[in-house]
UniProtKB/Swiss-Prot annotation, chains A, B:
Catalytic class of the enzyme: hydrolase
Gene encoding the protein: recU
GO MF terms, alphabetically ordered: endonuclease activity; magnesium ion binding; nucleic acid binding
Top-level taxonomic group: Bacteria
Main location: cytoplasm
InterPro entries in the record: Resolv_RecU, Restrct_endonuc-II-like, tRNA_endonuc-like_dom_sf
Cofactor binding, note field: Binds 1 Mg(2+) ion per subunit.
Gene Ontology, cellular component aspect: cytoplasm
Region (Disordered): 1-26
Protein name (record): Holliday junction resolvase RecU
Record function comment: Endonuclease that resolves Holliday junction intermediates in genetic recombination. Cleaves mobile four-strand junctions by introducing symmetrical nicks in paired strands. Promotes annealing of linear ssDNA with homologous dsDNA. Required for DNA repair, homologous recombination and chromosome segregation.
Site (Transition state stabilizer): K103
Cofactor entry: Mg(2+)
Length: 205, 205
């Protein structure tokens, strides 16, 4: 039996199509589910089973006007969405800092880099420099990929050099780690983190 | 010259009262500054100098109604403050996960435990279990203390046992690590993290 380092047994993943999955439908748009919902379920699974503590950060909001009615809760009457200067998810696995962003595309040929903005790339570079484990989870072409931040940086810099504004399907399949979707956890990205950063044959530190 | 592990030189702290500090005033309420502002400045200092990447999480808000006017930004028309289930600050230092909450009290005799709620304590326990570095920064009695989460747990559990709903001044001075306030960084909590978790004489892992 495969066990996580904390001694918890690893629950084997089930193929798409069992239980709540509708057979034959694999893209998020078709399934009526979202990448975010699947990641929240995954993080909840990690938390409950003591595998990792990873949370999605709240949506950043600029609050302009708040009403404080008597005998009831404060009501925010005017606020605006702010662009985040960091990534959406972070937390801890085996003491190490984990930081990632999740994105999906409906394009069938490539993943557009406009899904990220300069501030986020800058943040990811700072995290890598500080020894954190940083990556992006990309849902594209009917699959979900784990792309290490260092690879994203390569494509980001190339955009500046030759103007190519996307990662082609072939490139993503080559640089990314394909994740098999399961029932619970749905997107077992910690398995990839474990392989890349903690196993004996780890390519990374 | 003292250097951080990344080779950056340590900027010696300056006593309270120099530059923008008004001599003789040491509590946040008197100075017209907030603990949060000082921590934001400190985190900015760490970021710019490549010492650590720590951010305050956005305030969690439950969005109920959003207006999408033509040709201008979406306006949130109704939203409510939500209780956070985690702590306010997290990030990475030398690869390790850092997680903390900051609180201040105007009480002159003790620090009330009602500043925390069960969900936050639960989160801090999960972080500790996962090998993260977790603590609280408490501004009280004219000083700022770094209290390891494990000590906070002790006082939290005692509350359940004998009903004492606060940490006395003496107890905080005994269990907490007094931080000298500086000009930049203002509250050098990473110095305490370094001593407790990374130096040869580290009491912790």
């Amino acid at each position: 039996m495969i066990r996580y380092p904390n001694g918890k047994s690893y629950q084997p993943i089930q193929p798409i199509g069992t239980k709540k999955r509708i057979s034959g439908e694999s893209s998020y748009s078709n399934r009526g589910m979202t990448l975010e919902a699947d990641l929240n379920e995954t993080n909840q699974y990690y938390l409950v089973n003591g595998i990792a503590v990873i949370h999605k950060k709240p949506t950043p909001v600029q609050i302009v006007n708040v009403d404080y009615p008597k005998r009831s809760a404060a009501v925010i009457k005017e606020a605006y969405f702010k662009q985040s200067s960091t990534t959406d998810y972070n937390g801890v696995y085996r003491g190490r800092y984990i930081d990632f962003e999740a994105k999906e595309t409906k394009s069938t040929t490539s993943f557009p880099l406009k899904n990220f903005h300069e501030h986020q790339i800058e943040h990811m570079k700072q995290v890598e420099k500080q020894g954190g484990i940083c990556f992006v989870i990309i849902s594209a072409f009917g699959s979900v990929y784990y792309l290490p931040a260092s690879d994203l940086f390569f494509f980001w810099e190339r955009q500046k050099l030759n103007g190519r504004k996307s990662i082609s399907k072939d490139e993503l399949m080559e640089a990314g780690h394909l994740m098999t979707l399961g029932y619970s956890p749905r997107i077992d990205y910690i398995k990839v983190v474990e392989t890349l950063h903690f196993s004996d044959e780890s390519e990374y530190q």
